[in-house]
């Protein structure tokens, strides 16, 4: 690697690409994964790893923006922590590299870049997590020092001398916040010491504390179905408002979207609404429920929105009427955006005409306009909601 002057600071070429690189310095071997690190030499035996966040985690970038880690990321970090248990055989340098892989995403959530400063001349700080001021964020610029203290014995206590060394190193390096990470136990006097009034903030983290940190950042499982329902409802509400203002908007909607808009409109007018499935709906698209004279009443709404501008004929009308009668419902409403044929109602009796009402595009627009007024507080539902349905 061409080391010329052991005492001089000399930059080493950046390792580009995504291949695995192995760099040997003296007797130590450092393996670099797929993080595209930049490597610089600061003396004969010491290296510093600067880990850049822009090259990793593309698949979970949304979660990072929301301040969360995916379940897969958290599980991977838990596995790394298992390697740091006191009965493992890692040497101090290997333990630091494992810890670095854990710290990287945890600090990255808050916009920090993690720099590994460990080695023979680490000056008491193994990692520096730095965040620069950003115009797009209110987070202040800050550098946090992290010192690792790992043991191979199953039961080990972190000595007060280690804590005092960390405080001294932090003050010498003008750090205002430091973290001591260990797989050992922190004695009571250590916790008492960090709670005292000091010119810097000190945090003590054992393996359990690290796991708790990961758990807090775990992205909760999203109820996708509920999210979709909310989005569709918001879309339906927006389309209803658009139709109320510009009726021609109906010409640009598919039949299922019109059904969803009508369902949203009737719910906004005070009905309890059930939108039936897109297929095998049993001959009705929307089921409306309301109270009439103290009794529960149920009505079927069928909607025809054919992009071919086809009008509804008598067969479809008779089919809906038959379903209403056979299922003993209180009535129904047939909406057709392009109207009905001239003979669509010829076979209907007076009773049937009373039980089943009809409406075209103008009727749908009127419903949407009433919906907008209701949402603005300019319209209140009548005591008998069927007046809205059959007006």
UniProtKB/Swiss-Prot annotation:
Note one Pfam family from the annotation.
Mrr_cat
Keyword list (alphabetical) reads:
Plasmid
| Gene3D superfamilies attached to this UniProt entry | 3.40.1350.10
Which GO BP annotation is one of this protein's?
Answer: DNA restriction-modification system
Top-level taxon: Bacteria
Give the SUPFAM superfamilies listed for this entry. Answer: Restriction endonuclease-like (SSF52980)
Q: Does the keyword Membrane apply?
A: no
Cystine crosslinks: none
The answer to keyword Membrane applying to this record is: no
InterPro entries reported in the protein's UniProt record: Restrct_endonuc-II-like, Restrct_endonuc_IV_Mrr, tRNA_endonuc-like_dom_sf, Type_IV_Methyl-Rstrct_Enzyme
GO function terms (MF aspect): DNA binding; restriction endodeoxyribonuclease activity
Q: Which PANTHER family match?
A: MRR RESTRICTION SYSTEM PROTEIN (PTHR30015), TYPE IV METHYL-DIRECTED RESTRICTION ENZYME ECOKMRR (PTHR30015:SF7)
Its recorded name reads Uncharacterized protein y4cE
